[in-house]
Amino acid sequence: MSRSATLLLCLLGCHVWKAVTKTLREPGAGAQEVTLKVHISDASTHQPVADALIEIFTNQASIASGTSGTDGVAFIKFQYKLGSQLIVTASKHAYVPNSAPWKPIRLPVFSSLSLGLLPERSATLMVYEDVVQIVSGFQGARPQPRVHFQRRALRLPENTSYSDLTAFLTAASSPSEVDSFPYLRGLDGNGTGNSTRHDLTPVTAVSVHLLSSNGTPVLVDGPIYVTVPLATQSSLRHNAYVAAWRFDQKLGTWLKSGLGLVHQEGSQLTWTYIAPQLGYWVAAMSPPIPGPVVTQDITTYHTVFLLAILGGMAFILLVLLCLLLYYCRRKCLKPRQHHRKLQLPAGLESSKRDQSTSMSHINLLFSRRASEFPGPLSVTSHGRPEAPGTKELMSGVHLEMMSPGGEGDLHTPMLKLSYSTSQEFSSREELLSCKEEDKSQISFDNLTPSGTLGKDYHKSVEVFPLKARKSMEREGYESSGNDDYRGSYNTVLSQPLFEKQDREGPASTGSKLTIQEHLYPAPSSPEKEQLLDRRPTECMMSRSVDHLERPTSFPRPGQLICCSSVDQVNDSVYRKVLPALVIPAHYMKLPGDHSYVSQPLVVPADQQLEIERLQAELSNPHAGIFPHPSSQIQPQPLSSQAISQQHLQDAGTREWSPQNASMSESLSIPASLNDAALAQMNSEVQLLTEKALMELGGGKPLPHPRAWFVSLDGRSNAHVRHSYIDLQRAGRNGSNDASLDSGVDMNEPKSARKGRGDALSLQQNYPPVQEHQQKEPRAPDSTAYTQLVYLDDVEQSGSECGTTVCTPEDSALRCLLEGSSRRSGGQLPSLQEETTRRTADAPSEPAASPHQRRSAHEEEEDDDDDDQGEDKKSPWQKREERPLMAFNIK
């Protein structure tokens, strides 16, 4: 209870204290009456001025007023509060008003104040037709104060003419005269209701009036130009601005009106101001600046401002120029390998995606091998000398970096064919002599077609990186560029793969029926090890032909044709060169649970029976490829040696020419592609162990595929038909299984083509492989090959190439044996290759020997006969009528 009462008393005391304080602060509170004596006199004559009006102002408000008597004295009483500042003002007609501040520090008992009034000077009034001019009455050598305005701005009172007008113009020519003007305390309003008082520093002052006959002021509406000369000792400069203040008699203070401009007239400075009305004007600056008065020159200000703007713009332009120079210099000096990246078109990108995703497990196997053996890979030497003519022989193929702009591109290797007939034949002779010396060192396993092919391939492939090095040295790249070039490729022939192959080789040497490729690695050197082509296999197989350069001539059949359009290849070219792509079937193995194995084909109802039969046969993928019993198969280890000897004998006796070169019946592998792709595939397939295949298949044996088709025409995978045909039924009688898209009829009689006599011989050379596969099921090697036929057009393929009828084992094995014969013969012409191949088949089937040795003229006639059999197409070929593959033609 007591605590609440105490709190209530405290609140009451606070309110009382606030009320008392507010009462004490009210105006008049504590003020005392004071009497002030004011004496008014003439400033020029010091005579008392009677009837002068005296007013006392505080805070722009009049608190007291009075009138002087005849003696010029007036006593004024008013309430004064100590600390307040008062302004005492005296004014009279024909005098310039004057004022003075009054602020005592203590409350006085008596106070007196004297004010001198400056009489106004009469001026000369000049009324013209358009202008009214008022000029000071004192004429002299120096300029005089003057005022002029438009005549129409003058508002004359009624019954008043120009003759009734009187003008007064008074200008302060000295500091003493400036003191005769009202006290210079200015009030500067900022437009927000708040005003600031300033003590002004005067420069000059002027008073101008126009009176009528009865002494009343005459109004002037319009701009009034007031010009006042300045003192000679003024510190102002030309084009300087000085504020103009107008005296308000009702407020007793100076109000800021505008700015006046200082001009230079000869040697005299004048201040000119456009006033809205007549009255008392003063040129002054605030706040007061001690020392000489200095104003800012507007021209200098504008000049500095413009220079600042121009300087900023120049700086910005300089920065932009520096950036442009830096960019240009960077583009010019940037290393070529950093910015020359081939911009592939959208179609080519889509084609590459189709190719890379349609290549079954070969990509996974290669990537797995690369991940298992990281780091730099090389090929070591086994003590075999380099062939003398190998370097010149491979000089016909140049690895050049081409880009659309014509400049080198380290990321786009292209094959440019350039042949020299004399160098080619001399290189072949040297290679033949080298092979005669190496014949004694060939093992039994290397006598097989696969072994000879792999050995000769590695002899030729060691020169291929050297050619790339020469091309790079001609471009002038440094070692850093070569490192980037080597780093952007994956190795094609890796040392761990060869080591693994060498370890697998001795394990199977006990069996004479084993056909295995013992590849002889090329002699190694630091330069060769560093310059091995490390390009990924999938990239090599999917290179678009749009950027390949077409050769100038076609020296022999079987060469790789590089052209931008298939339309440029005429009938003669097709009869000389047969582009083909052969992929071994054992490359393309699918797991049993793969989606494509059980994928149904979208076909008409009349084909459903055939498709069901093919899918039923897919469940037995490991059946024998050839129907011949094993008892009828006899190994012939000397057939390959006989082929090589016969090939060497024919090399010196026959001369090759494009005219007498015999052509292969089916689309075979070109010579360059046979070296770079088929031998590489056969060598790498040996390294794919059963363990790796089972790991990819999820621990289950991978079934043998029927066929595999790769899209190279830029179509998406959704538009590519994946068909599977059992190759094991290809050799059976009555089997007509073939590619659904290639148009190959396996049931067509082989006698329809005279050149098919060697197919039986080739089939008889490979049964040992089948027997060995049955004995050793874990061996990863397989001899089932599937040929991918390149058909640009159905009509062109039938009429020009003449290769629509073939068997997978016929075409694939002939291509392999053809490649082996070419390697054994040292890159002999195609005519010698055909003759040698048929001579090598003679021991297997003597009855077919006369038919195998036929001339080029007979082959051309057979091709014509085959063209006439265009109508004998299989149902599969007639149903599809479209090419299996087509390059991305633009």
UniProtKB/Swiss-Prot annotation:
Which residue ranges does the entry give as Cytoplasmic-facing topology? Answer: 325-890
Q: Name one GO biological process term.
A: stress fiber assembly
- Modification Phosphoserine, positions: S358, S360, S371, S422, S443, S525, S849, S855
* Amino acid composition bias (Basic and acidic residues), ranges on this chain: 747-757, 870-883
Record keywords, A-Z: Cell membrane, Glycoprotein, Membrane, Phosphoprotein, Signal, Transmembrane, Transmembrane helix
Biased composition (Polar residues) is annotated at: 822-833
Query: What does UniProt note about where in the body, tissue by tissue, this protein is expressed?
Result: Expressed in heart, brain, liver, skeletal muscle, kidney and pancreas. In brain, expressed by glia, pyramidal neurons and astrocytes (at protein level). Highly expressed in placental trophoblasts.
Q: What is the effect of changing S136A?
A: No effect on glycosylation
Is Transmembrane a UniProt keyword of this protein?
Answer: yes
> What domain of life?
Eukaryota
Q: Which Pfam families match?
A: FAM171A1-2-B_C, FAM171A1-2-B_N
Can you tell me which residues are glycosylated? Answer: N159, N190, N194
- Which protein family is named in the record? Belongs to the FAM171 family.
What is this protein called in UniProt? Protein FAM171A1
Output the lineage of the source organism. Answer: Eukaryota, Metazoa, Chordata, Craniata, Vertebrata
